[in-house]
């Protein structure tokens, strides 16, 4: 099992647009073989002192995959290529943290 935390840096003020596109994508990804969990998240405003600063132009994606092979297949899926084309101009940078259970 692999856990993935994707950080998507969004063009200023355009997170709602990206979320609309992303919500179209989610059911397709969740139907992929080996996808255990896949969903968008944004920073919550809380009174917790040690929380990192809220980032209004960042979208996080919390993922869980059955295997490295499933994750690699996901990155090559046709709907992912279509999504990437639709969000040109909205997404500035994507970074992944790929984690394994300790």
Feature-to-residue mapping (PLM):
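Generic N-terminal initiation segments characterized by hydrophobic and/or small/turn-forming residues
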Residues: 15-16, 22, 56, 68, ...
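Short, well-ordered beta-strand segments in beta-rich or mixed alpha/beta enzyme
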Residues: 2-9, 39-75
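Absolute protein N-terminus
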Residues: 1-2, 102
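Short amphipathic alpha-helical segments
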Residues: 14-40, 78-83, 87
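Generic structural motif
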Residues: 11-13, 101
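Glycine-rich beta-strand-turn "strand-cap" elements at beta-sheet edges
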Residues: 39-57, 82-102
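Generic structural signal for secondary-structure transition and capping sites
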Residues: 27-30, 34, 70, 92-96
């Amino acid at each position: 099992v692999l856990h993935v935390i994707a950080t998507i840096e969004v063009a200023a003020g355009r997170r709602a647009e990206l979320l609309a596109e992303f919500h179209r994508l989610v059911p397709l990804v969740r139907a992929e073989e080996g996808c255990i969990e896949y969903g968008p998240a944004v920073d919550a405003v809380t009174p917790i002192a040690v929380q990192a600063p809220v980032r209004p132009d960042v979208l996080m994606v919390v993922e869980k995959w059955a295997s490295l092979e499933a994750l690699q297949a996901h990155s090559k899926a046709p709907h992912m290529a279509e999504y990437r084309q639709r969000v040109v101009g909205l997404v500035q940078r994507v970074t992944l943290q790929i984690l394994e259970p300790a």
